[in-house]
Amino acid sequence: MNINFTLISQAMAFAIFIWFTVRFVWPPLMRAIENRQKTIAEGLAAGERGKRELELASQRSGDVVREAKQRASDIIAQAEKRAAEIVDEAKVAAREEGDRILVGAKAEVEQEVFRAKEVLRQQVAGLALAGAAKILRREVDEKAHAELLASLKAEL
């Protein structure tokens, strides 16, 4: 064996191996590496997009929460206002009812006073008649002296 032949055959085998590797092995490896780089780049871009979307969603949720709080405070204010109106309406209604009851009671008292005065007038007229009868020692006829009794009632 000649060392030159061995060296040349090894160099040719190495050259064939390099050619085979460059021709058939290297392109799929490069495609796999490029695909992996694309996947990583897309993942990073998606992560950035997700981060931006998360920030936007956080802002939107904050806006929604603020709006909901504002609406809630508006609703509470309206409810308090309506409650105050209802209380005022109830006070007015109660005052009107009290006034109506007071007017009715005053009218009833006036009627009772009038009735009591009438009863008192009749009793006084009866007493006056009895007193006059005792003074005159005779009985006074009510029919005959109706005019006298009417004027006596009017004076009382």
From Swiss-Prot:
Please name the InterPro entries in this protein's record: ATP_synth_B-like_membr_sf (IPR028987), ATP_synth_b/b'su_bac/chlpt (IPR002146), ATP_synth_F0_bsu_bac (IPR005864), ATP_synthase_B_chain (IPR050059)
Subcellular location, record wording: Cell inner membrane
Answer yes or no on keyword Transport: yes
Q: What is its main location?
A: membrane
- Which Pfam families does the protein's record reference? ATP-synt_B
Q: Name one GO cellular component term.
A: proton-transporting ATP synthase complex
Functional note:
F(1)F(0) ATP synthase produces ATP from ADP in the presence of a proton or sodium gradient. F-type ATPases consist of two structural domains, F(1) containing the extramembraneous catalytic core and F(0) containing the membrane proton channel, linked together by a central stalk and a peripheral stalk. During catalysis, ATP synthesis in the catalytic domain of F(1) is coupled via a rotary mechanism of the central stalk subunits to proton translocation. Component of the F(0) channel, it forms part of the peripheral stalk, linking F(1) to F(0).
Q: How does it assemble?
A: F-type ATPases have 2 components, F(1) - the catalytic core - and F(0) - the membrane proton channel. F(1) has five subunits: alpha(3), beta(3), gamma(1), delta(1), epsilon(1). F(0) has three main subunits: a(1), b(2) and c(10-14). The alpha and beta chains form an alternating ring which encloses part of the gamma chain. F(1) is attached to F(0) by a central stalk formed by the gamma and epsilon chains, while a peripheral stalk is formed by the delta and b chains.
> Which HAMAP family is this protein grouped with?
ATP_synth_b_bprime
Q: Which organism is it from?
A: Nitrosospira multiformis (strain ATCC 25196 / NCIMB 11849 / C 71)
Q: Which GO terms describe its molecular function?
A: proton-transporting ATP synthase activity, rotational mechanism; proton-transporting ATPase activity, rotational mechanism
Q: How does it sit in the membrane?
A: Single-pass membrane protein
Q: Which protein family is named in the record?
A: Belongs to the ATPase B chain family.
Keywords of this protein's UniProt record, alphabetized?
A: ATP synthesis, Cell inner membrane, Cell membrane, CF(0), Hydrogen ion transport, Ion transport, Membrane, Transmembrane, Transmembrane helix, Transport
Work out whether the entry's keyword set contains Ligase. Answer: no
TM regions (residue ranges): 5-27
Q: What is this protein called?
A: ATP synthase subunit b 1
